[in-house]
A protein has these predicted regions:
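Extended, highly charged accessory segments
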Residues: 51, 74, 93, 97-175, ...
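Conserved segment of the helicase C-terminal RecA-like domain
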Residues: 27-78
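Secondary-structure transition/capping motifs at alpha-helix termini
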Residues: 9, 13, 22-23, 27, ...
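Short acidic, glycine/serine/threonine-rich loops at helix termini
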Residues: 12-15, 31-34, 43, 58-63, ...
Length: 457
């Protein structure tokens, strides 16, 4: 019997003696649920996990104690996230009227949030209690897997069959016109994206390639929660605005991963208000990296960012796709891919040092020489939109990553073994400027915004 991961939800099929799990299923809980489908009636069972080449799969192969010694229920959730709380309040009001006495159950601020929902005509107030304003069943509008309010339906032209559904963000990143959509091993080309009706039209087409979207990200800090100095850097936990512009897509040949062409994407930017764990490399780290040539530090930053994300996902019991990262100048951002944040970045901030130790261990234990998809390079199993061509083009990303990790952990300086790397001709990054007085910085930013408006006129 072959099944998708849906089998893990508790269906008792009975009579199974073994289970083969292909690739890490995403969390310890999912692994135990899938493994638990076998041996339910007749004693012992046998479970195999066929590991992929992603860092998480390889981590559990080398560290089985992380699997069998982990609690499957230690999930991370941000209960104060207004995106989550507002949806729960609306659903709760359908069951029973809400009052200020519910602060003990639902957390402080229920009254204030209900007032806002009343202004938005989702709740109505009568006699100090809030009721649902409309005759509806609100739970049908609450997504369990995403905070997006919109889902795109995927329609196959010809037979006019509905083949699937994707949330708004995933659709923007993978179902743009010209994209290749893969469904049940068949390839389809996206012919039209109808934003009005949230409909994507695809046509079955045999291709020898798949597509990857190209993006540019801009991260703006809107509120700082915590900051502290660590070895080689300053780390900060902050609310951020992530603006992602889709610049185009590339066509990648199956199996060889050869780039065979590009296409244009004409879609509006994606905006996300979330929480980020920021690693700001100090001036000394940037300056010391210069002796190893151009591209060295940037490549190391990408390697650290990718592995930090994956190993944070293990601790947070989430899919790596729930976390993203961005490298810009001397900054590494690790942020939640969920509006308002859901607690993953906060865990990364709290356990910064411990996760970096895991990252170094993963790099050292990988048997490759220069870097591979099991450690610092992007893998073919999922989109790695933040790992740009620079990390692929630098010949020794593993050595660069290892050097940077020694700096960030305060270990004895690591001497990278670089052969054939071009001699340094210029600094790979501009060293960060000394910090401005906060009031001065605000004034400069204000002037920049005002002059920008003037140019538009």
């Amino acid at each position: 019997m072959v099944s998708t991961s849906a089998l893990e939800v508790g269906i008792d099929v009975g009579g199974l003696d073994g289970c083969i799990i292909v690739g890490w299923p995403g969390s310890v809980c999912s692994f135990m649920q899938q493994a638990g489908r076998a041996g339910r009636r007749h004693g012992e069972s046998l479970v195999f996990m066929i590991a992929g080449n992603d860092p998480i799969d390889q981590w559990f192969v080398r560290h089985p104690e992380s699997l069998f010694g982990s609690s499957p229920e230690n999930a991370v959730i941000e209960t104060d996230n207004p995106y989550i709380v507002a949806r729960h309040l609306i659903c709760a009001a359908y069951e029973l009227p809400l009052t200020s006495a519910d602060d003990d159950l639902l957390g402080p601020g229920v009254t204030a949030m209900c007032t806002v929902l009343q202004e938005e005509k989702r709740l109505r107030e009568e006699g100090g209690a809030w009721y649902l304003a409309r005759e509806e069943y609100p739970a049908t509008q609450v997504k369990l897997r995403t905070a997006s309010e919109e889902n795109f339906t995927i329609l196959e032209l010809g037979p006019d069959n509905i083949v699937g559904e994707l949330d708004y963000v995933a659709a923007m990143l993978s179902l743009y016109e010209g994209a290749i959509y893969i469904h049940r091993t068949e390839t389809f080309i996206v012919e039209e994206m109808d934003h009005v009706n949230c409909l994507v039209k695809i046509r079955r087409t045999k291709t020898g390639y798949y597509t990857q979207v190209l993006t540019q990200k801009r991260v703006t800090v809107t509120d700082e929660w915590d900051t502290r100095e660590v070895c080689g850097a300053r780390i900060r936990l902050a609310e951020v605005e992530i603006r992602t512009r889709l610049t185009g897509y590339k066509k990648v040949r199956f199996h060889s991963t050869e780039n065979i062409g590009y296409g244009e994407v004409h879609l509006p930017p994606l905006e996300l208000d979330t929480v980020s764990h920021e690693i700001s490399l100090d001036r000394e780290t940037v300056m010391q990296s210069e002796e190893h040539g151009p591209g060295f530090l940037r490549s190391g930053m990408h390697g650290v960012a990718r592995l930090f994300r994956d190993l944070l996902a293990i601790r947070a019991m989430c899919d790596p796709g729930d976390i993203d990262h961005h490298v810009d100048d001397n900054l590494i951002h690790i942020f939640d891919l969920y509006p308002g944040g859901i607690g993953y970045s906060e865990l990364g901030h709290e356990q910064h040092g411990e996760i970096l130790k895991d990252v170094l261990e993963a790099v050292v234990e990988c048997p490759c020489v220069a870097g591979c998809p099991s450690c610092v390079l992007p893998g073919a199993s999922r989109i790695e939109s933040s790992l740009e061509s620079e990390v692929m083009e630098y010949p020794y990303p593993k050595e660069a990553t290892r050097w940077l990790l020694h700096r960030l952990l305060g270990l004895e300086p690591y001497k990278p073994e670089l052969h054939g790397v071009p001699a340094p001709v210029e600094s790979p990054l501009n060293p960060p400027a000394p910090a401005l007085d906060e009031r001065v910085e605000r004034k400069i930013r204000k002037v920049a915004r005002l002059t920008s408006r003037g140019n538009r006129g």
